[in-house]
Amino acid sequence: MKAVFDTNILVSAIFWRGSPYRCLLAAQAGLVELYVSPPILAELVRVLQDKFQLSPEWVDEVVGAVRGVARVVEISGTVHVVVDDPSDDKFIETAQMANVEYLVSGDHHLLTYGELGEVRVVTARMFLDILSQSSQ
């Protein structure tokens, strides 16, 4: 199963032990092929530095850990779908470029789409339920 996790899922997985954390554990265990793009990693760096005021060393360690679990795909920045928050377009384009089945998000701007072509936009809890059903 292939997926893209948006930045809020990645940040939640880093700091808390809820559903996003379990999604990241599934990727670490090889149950999920996780994909990111340079703009997603850049946003992760910005959020960790600006919002959480983490040291550059800690940020580098976290981003390195995400890179260790995920495959990085290049995007062009030409997808323009999310009218209410164009900065979310990078997640959709990454999902399309990586040909994933799921975009895991907690962002209502993305979740309202439900499906974008072949990509289903789901919450972390929904993704865990899907993973659980697929392993039975």
Regions found by a protein language model. Name each.
Residues 31-34, 99-101, 118-119:
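Short active-site oxyanion
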Residues 18, 35, 57, 61, ...:
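Residues at secondary-structure transition points
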Residues 69-102, 108:
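Active-site neighborhoods of divalent-metal-dependent phosphate/nucleic-acid chemistry enzymes
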